[in-house]
Amino acid sequence: MDSRMLSDQRFCRRIFAAALCVLVLLADSGCARNLWKRALHLKMTEKYDDYEYPLHSHSAHYQKNDRCPPPPQTLPDRACEVPSCRSDSECERHKRCCYNGCIYACLESVQPPPVLDWLVQPKPRWLGGNGWLLDGPEEVLQAEACSTTEDGDEPLHCPTGYECHIINPGNTAEGIPNRGQCIKLRGNPDGRNLRHKYYKEYFGSNSNNVVGYVKNQQKHLG
């Protein structure tokens, strides 16, 4: 009896050990499967990143580079066959790494558009009740902003010897003033002050009349 019981115990131990080994193998197989799936996912992600990264990088570069010409509406000939670039340092001094409609290549740079800041305070002028009639200091103006719109405040007049060339008519109904640039008057210097007075008294805040008057004067002087 004792030998039989010992034999049964050994058999049970063997079965338990075998079952434990099977469980361990199944667990290892699940871990291995999960590790394999994770490695495959990372590999595919790396491949996707390798493909997308240059596009994202170039796109961000293009947005920041204001010396690039605008992308063409139609694909130019051999646009995809020219040497590509990834930064301006790979191009000649007068060229920039820009999108040519197919790839990023070294293209001729363009000048950035001029900036007209409406919030920049104009250069100092002589102050007074009729300050706009007084001669101010002679100076060279570089795209100084001006306006002829009156909405309770004194308009942003140009210095003596300059007139306001309206570029944007604005919208008086929405409270948006017109704006322009100061250009030097041509013709008789003795009558240049009276021209500002003529604007003030006869045209007031009507920017259309001012624009028409300026055009007529330019035709007359031309």
Curated annotation (Swiss-Prot):
Signal peptide from the UniProt entry: 1-32
Cellular localization per UniProt: Secreted
Annotated organism of origin: Gallus gallus (Chicken)
Name the UniProt record assigns to this protein: WAP four-disulfide core domain protein 1
Function of the protein: Has growth inhibitory activity.
Cysteines joined through disulfide linkages: C68-C98, C80-C102, C85-C97, C91-C106
InterPro entries noted in UniProt: Elafin-like_sf (IPR036645), WAP_dom (IPR008197), WFDC1 (IPR042357)
Keywords from the named record: Disulfide bond, Protease inhibitor, Secreted, Serine protease inhibitor, Signal
Any coiled-coil regions, as ranges: none
Main location: secreted
Any GO molecular function: serine-type endopeptidase inhibitor activity
Gene3D superfamilies in alphabetical order: Elafin-like
GO BP of this protein: negative regulation of inflammatory response; negative regulation of wound healing; regulation of cell growth
